[in-house]
Design a protein with these regions (language model features):
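Von Willebrand factor
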Residues: 1-25, 37-39, 82-84
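Von Willebrand factor type A / integrin I
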Residues: 23, 39, 46-167
Length: 167
């Protein structure tokens, strides 16, 4: 398997926005907000055990850039997660390849304790990402690829509008 890309760089997109958009704008950032292992190492965040290193909390470098953009613009973060980023099916030993980096890892999904630890870690990472957005004053919504998103987005923007009108 040869990855089509060598990763994505959210910071480059955000830096571009800061350069080209001089007037205040609503910037909707759609991402999984998963920090790459290299980005995590650069920013000093604690590494997860390699066999469970599928989802990490928002990397500090991207978060700093999002805060910077939010000072000039109105940032809305839409976090997309896949079912299998949040849970591991009991399929035994799996070899996984990261489509962005090409990194290959083997994990044993047959171990119930590892699956439970994985789910707990992923939920903690999602909660931490949402907390970081709130602390920076960035409105955010989490959507899953295996669930309908239309009503969730409508409710999010409806609630956001009410809060902005009355807040």
């Amino acid at each position: 398997f040869e990855p089509k890309r060598r990763g994505t760089d959210l910071n480059k997109a955000l830096e571009f926005l800061l350069r080209v958009q001089s007037h205040k704008a609503v910037a909707v950032v759609v991402s999984d907000f998963i920090g790459s292992p290299a980005e995590t190492r650069r920013t000093g965040q604690r590494q997860l055990r390699p066999q469970l290193q599928l989802l990490e909390s928002l990397a500090q470098a991207s978060f700093s850039m999002l805060k910077q953009v939010n000072r000039r613009h109105d940032v809305v973060a839409v976090q997309i997660t896949d079912r299998y980023e949040l849970e591991l099916p009991a399929l035994g030993r799996l070899v996984l390849c990261d489509a962005e980096t090409g990194e290959v890892m083997e994990i044993n999904t047959g171990d119930a304790r590892k699956r439970e630890a994985f789910v707990a870690r992923q939920n903690k990472a999602l909660a931490e990402t949402a907390r970081l957005f709130r602390s920076a004053g960035i409105d955010s919504v989490q959507l899953r690829t295996d669930q309908p998103y239309g009503s969730a987005l409508a409710k999010f923007f409806e609630t956001r509008e009410k809060r902005r009108r009355h807040g």
